C-alpha cells in the first residue's frame, strides 16, 4: 500500500481503501452493494423508458422525475462500479484527475438533485395554488430552463472545489484515502498546505444549498397546505395532498440521509470509520433505489404504464 509518512509529495494517483477496517469482508459486502446498484439502475432506466414511451406522462412533473432519474444514475454510477472493482479485483488505484473528476460529479449532481426537488416543489405549488395557469407557467421551455439552471448552479457551486485542490494544495502527506471514493473532505484532509479556505468553501456551499433549498421547499408547502385547507371537503383535501405525497417522500429520502451523514461526519468522533464510509455510500444509493419505487407506488399513471410492459416492449421492437 502506498503511504509516505511525513513526506509531502505530488501524487499521480491515490489509493482508495474501500471500507476501512472491513477489508476482509469486501467480497461479501459486494453482494448487497452490487444488488442495490442493479436495483437503482433498473428502476431509474425503467422510469426514463416509461415516461418516454407513454405520451400521457409528457407533463412537467414527469419530466422533472426523468431529470431526477438521470441524476440518480450519475450519482450511483460515479461511485459504485469503482467500489465493486475494489471489492472484487483490488482495483484501489485511482488517478489524480480521475479522483477530482469523481469528486466533482458526486458533489455537483447532489447539488443539481436538490435544485430539481426545488423545481418540483414549484411545480406542485403552481398546480395546486394556481391550477388554471399551470399549463401556461410550466411550459416545456420553462421546465427545460429550470433543469438547466439547476445544472448550471451545481457546476458553478462545485466547480471550484477540485480546482482549488488542484491549484492551492498540490502536495499530499499520503496517497491513501481511507474511503471508497474521492469525497472532498477526505481528500483535503491529506493535503500538506493550509486547507482552511477549501474547508470553509466546501462547508459554506453545503449549508447554503441545504438551507436555502430546504427553506424554499418548506415555504412552497406552507402555501400549498394553506390552499388545501381552503378546499370544501376532506375528500378533496386528501386527493390534492395525495398529488404531493411522492414528492414529499422523495425529499425526505434525499435530505434525511444527507443531514444524518453530515452530522455524524462532523460531530460523530466516536463513530467507527467503517460506519462513516458505509453511511456515505448508502447516502448515494438510497435515493436512486427508493425514488423510482416511491413514484411507481404512489403515482397512478406510472403504475398503469408499468402494468403494460409487454405493450411497451412491442413498441420498442
Swiss-Prot record:
Q: Where are the Cytoplasmic topological domains?
A: 49-56, 123-141, 221-240, 298-317
Membrane topology annotation = Multi-pass membrane protein
What domain of life does the UniProt record list for this protein's source? Eukaryota
Q: Which UniProt keywords apply?
A: Cell membrane, Disulfide bond, G-protein coupled receptor, Membrane, Olfaction, Receptor, Sensory transduction, Transducer, Transmembrane, Transmembrane helix
- Sample GO molecular function, one term: G protein-coupled receptor activity
Q: Which InterPro entries match?
A: GPCR_Rhodpsn, GPCR_Rhodpsn_7TM, Olfact_rcpt, OR51/52/56-like
Per the UniProt entry, the disulfide pairs are 99-192
Its recorded name reads Olfactory receptor 52M1
Amino acid at each position: 500500500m502506498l503511504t509516505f509518512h511525513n513526506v509531502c509529495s505530488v501524487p499521480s494517483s491515490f489509493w482508495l481503501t474501500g471500507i476501512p477496517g472491513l477489508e476482509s469482508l469486501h467480497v461479501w459486502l459486494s453482494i448487497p452493494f452490487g444488488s442495490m446498484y442493479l436495483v437503482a439502475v433498473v428502476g431509474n432506466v425503467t422510469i426514463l423508458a416509461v415516461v418516454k414511451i407513454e405520451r400521457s406522462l409528457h407533463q412537467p412533473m414527469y419530466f422533472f422525475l426523468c431529470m431526477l432519474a438521470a441524476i440518480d444514475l450519475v450519482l450511483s454510477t460515479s461511485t459504485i462500479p469503482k467500489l465493486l472493482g475494489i471489492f472484487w479485483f483490488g482495483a484501489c488505484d485511482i488517478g489524480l484527475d480521475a479522483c477530482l473528476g469523481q469528486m466533482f460529479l458526486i458533489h455537483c449532481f447532489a447539488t443539481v438533485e436538490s435544485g430539481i426537488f426545488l423545481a418540483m416543489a414549484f411545480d406542485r405549488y403552481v398546480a395546486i395554488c394556481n391550477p388554471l395557469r399551470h399549463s401556461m407557467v410550466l411550459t416545456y421551455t420553462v421546465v427545460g430552463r429550470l433543469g438547466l439552471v439547476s445544472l448550471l448552479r451545481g457546476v458553478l457551486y462545485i466547480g471550484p472545489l477540485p480546482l482549488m485542490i488542484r491549484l492551492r494544495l498540490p502536495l499530499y502527506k499520503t496517497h491513501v484515502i481511507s474511503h471508497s471514493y474521492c469525497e472532498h473532505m477526505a481528500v483535503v484532509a491529506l493535503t500538506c498546505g493550509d486547507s482552511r479556505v477549501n474547508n470553509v468553501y466546501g462547508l459554506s456551499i453545503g449549508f447554503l444549498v441545504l438551507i436555502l433549498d430546504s427553506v424554499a421547499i418548506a415555504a412552497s408547502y406552507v402555501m400549498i397546505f394553506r390552499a388545501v385547507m381552503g378546499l370544501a371537503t376532506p375528500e378533496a383535501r386528501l386527493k390534492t395532498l395525495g398529488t404531493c405525497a411522492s414528492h414529499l417522500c422523495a425529499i425526505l429520502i434525499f435530505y434525511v440521509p444527507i443531514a444524518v451523514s453530515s452530522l455524524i461526519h462532523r460531530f460523530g468522533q466516536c463513530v467507527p470509520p467503517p460506519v462513516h464510509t458505509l453511511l456515505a455510500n448508502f447516502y448515494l444509493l438510497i435515493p436512486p433505489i427508493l425514488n423510482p419505487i416511491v413514484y411507481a407506488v404512489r403515482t397512478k399513471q406510472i403504475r398503469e404504464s408499468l402494468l403494460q410492459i409487454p405493450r411497451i416492449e412491442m413498441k420498442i421492437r
